[in-house]
Structures are given as structure tokens and as C-alpha cells.
Regions:
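Metalloprotease/metallohydrolase-associated module, dominated by Zn2+-dependent proteases
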Residues: 1-63, 79-117
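Active-site recognition of the HExxH zinc-binding catalytic motif
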Residues: 66-78
């Protein structure tokens, strides 16, 4: 399926409620045309963070979920831990493991493959 900003926003709202207790602020949602990165949490240039997804991949529900949760973990660490963490260090790794074992969500990307159109 083609990724849209509407899909990303709807899933963000759903996952924020389900997994993050609505602790994440609303961000802007965008799409980008490059294959790398698959998705990204963009730093604010206008005071607002944004999440963007690549349009070159054939997305499905599981890929969207796993990838968006990955970005939401980054956002959670920035907002709630007051750390500007965009790497995949120990805090990120521990949250990723929690999602893997508790919810069976591959936010760490260990088992994820991204098919192109």
C-alpha cells in the first residue's frame, strides 16, 4: 500500500493511546522520496518535530506499525526523558526490547524487511 500522511497520523494517534498513554505530543507528518532512511524523526526547524516515511516502499500494516513505533520511541525519549537522543543507544534498546517481548512489535528492526514497489 502507498503510505499517506493521513495513515501515519491515524496510526500515531492510535499507538500513542495504546502504548504511550497519550504522553507524546502531536507532530507533523510528511513523506519523502528517498529510500534511505525508511522513515525519520526530523528535528525542528520551525519549532515542531515531524515524522516522515519514504514513498518508495510497499507498506503494509505490520511495517507501518513497527516503523512508526520505532520513531515514537525516539520521540518518547526526547519528550519524556528530556534527552535529545536520536541514536540507538541503551535507553532506545531497552524500550525496543520491551515492545518486542511485551507486544511482539519489532521496533528494533531485527526481523523487518522493506519491499519496494
Amino acid at each position: 500500500m502507498e503510505i499517506t500522511t493521513r495513515i501515519i497520523k491515524e496510526r500515531f494517534i492510535e499507538y500513542n493511546e495504546r502504548y504511550f498513554n497519550n504522553q507524546l505530543p502531536m507532530v507533523d507528518f510528511r513523506r519523502h522520496r528517498t529510500s534511505c532512511p525508511v522513515a525519520r524523526l526530523n528535528t525542528p526547524n520551525n519549532g515542531h518535530l515531524s515524522i516522515s516515511f519514504s514513498t518508495v516502499y510497499n507498506w503494509n500494516d505490520k511495517l507501518i506499525r513497527d516503523t512508526l513505533i520505532h520513531k515514537m520511541i525516539h520521540l518518547y525519549l526526547v519528550v519524556n526523558k528530556k534527552e535529545w537522543i536520536f541514536d540507538h543507544g541503551i535507553p532506545f534498546f531497552l524500550m525496543g526490547l520491551k515492545f518486542l517481548f511485551k507486544y511482539h512489535i519489532d521496533a528494533l528492526g531485527w526481523f523487518t524487511r522493506y519491499p519496494r514497489f
